[in-house]
Amino acid sequence: MSSSRNTHWCHRCQRAVRLHGQEPVCFYCGGGFVEELDMAQASPFDMFRSHRGVVERDQTFDLMDAFSVFMRNRLAERSHDREIRGRTISSGPENFPGLAPLLIFGGQVPYRLTGDNAVEALFNGGSPGIGITRGNTGDYFFGPGLEELFEQLSAGTTRRGPPPAPRSAIDALPTIKIAQRHLRSSDSNCPVCKDEFELGSEAKQMPCNHIYHSDCIVPWLVQHNSCPVCRQELPSASGPSSSQNRTTPTRNYRSSSSSSSSNSRENGNERRNPFSSFWPFRSSGSSSSSTQNRGGTRNSDTSDENHNYHQQQHQQSYMGYSGWPFDY
């Protein structure tokens, strides 16, 4: 009953084997705990088999045979429950009928499948013939929905969360001096930069009684109308002047911030703005205005753009924040 094809499964060797002579004995271990395989379908790797002796036979084929038989049985069981979708290739002498599933290693299939090539393809959907399933198009995200997603992601002007704090609300924040009671409480550190307050130094106090360094809380309030700790919003300013003040900041904040930053440099205790990495791009107002200018004059000189860029960088240097796009 010897054959070049593995006809039984040895439970001791845990692989597909051939019988040793006429007895139901494993060819490799000599054990009798073998089970006949369903050979209704040919092994997909018969085309790669060597006609040389058993000693020279590559054991990779044994693993591939066992895997092929296992998956073929699993697919046969599933076919009773539901219809397996896949491309059906007509059976013929040249199509190797019933070759499923098929395991293909990276690169061209050599005479002996050796090396560390990774698995490239697996299964052909249980359909007769050699083939590889295409991916289900329903599993991919494309079409109008994808375009809408890109539009939402590219909408840099879309805001999330509280709006920016009004200028009047930022101006109305009281400035306090750090006393011993502050250092003995949980307010001894600035929640933004985590630096400890110095006795007698100044700090800004929010309506929720949380205190911050002035150069730590002002950049936050320019973007968010709330406390970074408890999220309590600042009172909104009444009147149309608040929105105008937000879009056209005065030079008082720039001069005061510039002086405070220069003093901190002289003392050698300059604090790095923790929010500078959040705004690596230009402000929405400047980007929208530059977009309109480019739309009106597409062929303008690059020197004008460079001049505007350097002017903007000069304005940002008032606060000493790298990447900070506002005039505060």
From Swiss-Prot:
SMART domains: RING. The keyword Transmembrane does not apply. Residues 251-266, 275-290 have a biased composition (Low complexity). Its EC number is 2.3.2.27. Keywords: Acetylation, Metal-binding, Transferase, Ubl conjugation pathway, Zinc, Zinc-finger. Pathway: Protein modification; protein ubiquitination. Residues 233-324 are annotated as: Disordered. InterPro entries: RNF126-like_zinc-ribbon, Znf_RING, Znf_RING/FYVE/PHD. GO terms for biological process: negative regulation of gibberellic acid mediated signaling pathway; protein ubiquitination; response to salt stress; ubiquitin-dependent protein catabolic process. Residues 238-250, 291-300 have a biased composition (Polar residues). The modification N-acetylserine is found at residue 2. GO terms for molecular function: ubiquitin protein ligase activity; zinc ion binding. A zinc finger (RING-type) spans 190-231. GO terms for cellular component: nucleus; plant-type cell wall. It catalyses: S-ubiquitinyl-[E2 ubiquitin-conjugating enzyme]-L-cysteine + [acceptor protein]-L-lysine = [E2 ubiquitin-conjugating enzyme]-L-cysteine + N(6)-ubiquitinyl-[acceptor protein]-L-lysine. It is an enzyme of class 2 (transferase). PANTHER family: E3 UBIQUITIN-PROTEIN LIGASE PRAJA (PTHR15710), E3 UBIQUITIN-PROTEIN LIGASE RHC1A-RELATED (PTHR15710:SF34). Probable E3 ubiquitin-protein ligase that may possess E3 ubiquitin ligase activity in vitro. This is Probable E3 ubiquitin-protein ligase RHC1A.
